[in-house]
Amino acid sequence: VNYQKYNATNNTRTKCDLYFKVKPPMVSEYITTLAQTDTANLAVDDYGNTRYIGKNPNNFVSFDGDIWRIIGVMKNVDDGTGNKEDRVKIIRSESIGYYSWDTSESSVNNGRGVNEWSQADLMKLLNPGYESESVGGSLYWNNKSGTCYSDYKNQTTSCNFTSTGIKDKLKNMLGNAVWNTGASTTYSQIASKFYTEERGTRNGKICTSGTYCTDAVARTTTWTGKIGLMYPSDYGYATSGG
């Protein structure tokens, strides 16, 4: 085997300029840092989460032309597998319409549905994986039109999310998260109390008899998925700035 000898005289030298692009900070890092100076629009809650507050803070963000608002940076969000990281929580700026949280036949809770988010009709409308549902199934997630539940006793209406559904850019950013669905003991209390009870062990099955209490659905206090609703504590903390 012949090996070519390295000849040092074959080397050439030249001048060049190297440019390094500074990597921008993560949104969560940017907001957390901004909160140290912008105390009019941002505040850290009792549990270390950084939140936008006040009547109309500049917390808008756009994805593919859709406008959302940043609720804040939530600490140590579990992705459902035990991995935890800080996450930015956003809410759509405009309503997508009026649809049932859940509904049912009149024989079940007098047609009012069941207050269990993990099985709710609205959850199945918003999230992926429910395409087999004949009404509402993943229409919002898939940017499709069809029929959605709109009132009690399984009433339906036509719905169209071809322009308002989740766009691909945002889909690629949405990860699973553990949502806390613990029930509150009252409708009126401070935000920190709501926050604690959302993460508590009390579920939404608070009745034992009557026409509005006939379902046999097991209640849970957590749910893992991509799209949920604003917590009562989110609203309470957001309005704390006026």
Please describe what each predicted stretch is.
Residues 1-242:
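Long, domain-scale functional regions
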